[in-house]
Amino acid sequence: MFTPVIVIRGGREAALMDLDDVARLAEALTGVRRAAQEGLAEWRYHGRLVARQLDDVYLVIRADFDFRDSMLRQFPGTFSVPTRYIKHMMVVADLAGGDTGAIEDALEAAWQLQRSAD
């Protein structure tokens, strides 16, 4: 668990997550290692992708289709699936505007998915 930065948005408190938070969460998962491709961070479990930085705000997270559909329904402001990922087991998380708990859950689910392949 991490302590998010709290900001005021539209008169309400909202938590922010950044790539440092993602790094702390992902690297705390057994077997997950950080690497960089073309200057962008990625986290892998035994070589299998858990999550990858798209830019400073967006993170692509591995997710099976059922979990992805559930997260899209429950957290439409946090997760999306661009056209290029529709056929892939991936979901994009909005770190700056998304639900931090849901993103944390998605990272852990991605790790569990990759561990299940062992």
Which positions does each model-derived feature cover?
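Charge-dense, helix-prone N-terminal extensions
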Residues: 1-118
